[in-house]
């Protein structure tokens, strides 16, 4: 597939090469993520479960505001980069998560779509002030070396999808649905384990699984070409495909806790909005956050 290049394919491959070159930069520290995964839940320490719940809350906010998946992916990247470097107490996680989310929103969304910090805090039902949020933003920025933008799995998913989609017969193109792939990526982001995968590997694992499920044999060669071009080993791809498959199976079951978008809709209903007092008057100010490095 990649050997015979159209002008559009050449542009896509140029973009892919740029992403591959930048991929290793601005990613979470795997050793830090492993520490979180191994932590016991005592109500004080950061754990994988708490991290995953926070990401689900960020996904609910993303859906509520209608933000792009790239915004959500970047917010998760920032959160995991910070958590993998710093020892964060559970009581500070909401402020950290919302700060990462707000940074991602301001970096990717149009300025007119960026909500006020006061509105974001109120809708999220957190009990901290705008000054707390701004202070946490500065801490996050310092710990990620002021590098907000990063290469994400969503960017790879877009490119990989574009490379294979146009090779399908016209009548079958609608079956390989990008929104479905986006939803699968969001589900994976809600599990900390997938932040240990390279963004390119996670994206290709999701796409390859979907192609297998649709029995698109004609795209197998294309996936193999992308895999080779991206220098992804067969072992790595198989390993992460199995984990993605397991995650999606669990996510589609009733046992899985899914993001609660309805809760946010209720919070800002007309009746509720009239009853809400300004957040400042019911604030419990956060204590100074110790900047302890892992």
Curated annotation (Swiss-Prot):
The protein's name: Cyclin-G1
Main location: nucleus
Alphabetical list of SUPFAM superfamilies matching this protein: Cyclin-like
Tissues in which the UniProt entry reports expression: Highest levels in kidney, heart and skeletal muscle.
Location(s), subcellular: Nucleus
GO BP: cell division
UniProt function note: May play a role in growth regulation. Is associated with G2/M phase arrest in response to DNA damage. May be an intermediate by which p53 mediates its role as an inhibitor of cellular proliferation.
CDD domains according to UniProt: CYCLIN_CCNG1 (cd20583)
Any Gene Ontology CC annotation: nucleus
Subunit structure: Binds to B' regulatory B subunits of protein phosphatase A (PP2A) following induction by p53 (in vitro).
Keyword terms of this UniProt record: Cell cycle, Cell division, Cyclin, Mitosis, Nucleus
Protein family according to the UniProt entry: Belongs to the cyclin family. Cyclin G subfamily.
Membrane spanning stretches: none
